[in-house]
Amino acid sequence: GEVIEMGRIAIEAKLFNDIVRKLPNSEIFIETTPDYNTIIRCEKSKFVIPSKSGEDFTELPQIEKEKSIELSQFSLKEIIRQTIFSISDNENNKLMTGELFEVKDGVLQVVSLDGHRISLRNLALKGNASNVSVVVPGKTLNDLSKIITGGVDDMVTVYFTDRHILFEFENTIVVSRLLEGEYFKIVQMLSMDHKIKVRVNNRELFDCIDRASILMR
């Protein structure tokens, strides 16, 4: 894109996203008026939407980039996909609406649970990784998975503080507050003293469950 004149404006995110999604695949021109209206033009389409001064927009918190890990966008997207389904939507227990991100001895462990299911995913990290343990809101991870490309060679750097988590990739920065509190002791929940243990082909198991689920509708 080309910046003709520098400036700042605050636009309602959902409205702006809905407009851009409906526009044709062509050049988009965005300009603002002195009374903070934003004009969006694309081919024969024109939208005029109310906005606010960019000075009123909340600044991103200053994140100290001391504790961090790096992994591929593919790995992060897969981790979220394999764990996000077992977070809870019950706001009465905030910790269950998030996922535990714990880094220890060079291994990232991501855990989610909703009181009925537990999902756990481990990933060996390359290079030096800071030991951390934080709970990330599920909504943040769900939104993040929609905007990362998932490329194997595209990297994401994740920074941790006591209150925030920051994801940095390409030209994008995503910052989120963390959920407060101590996460559940997963090791105590996962007893390894199994009387019966089976090993099955995951594709065949998925197909069986998929067929059986027809009768549950």
What is the role of each PLM region?
Residues G1-R217:
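Structural preference for solvent-exposed beta-strand-turn elements
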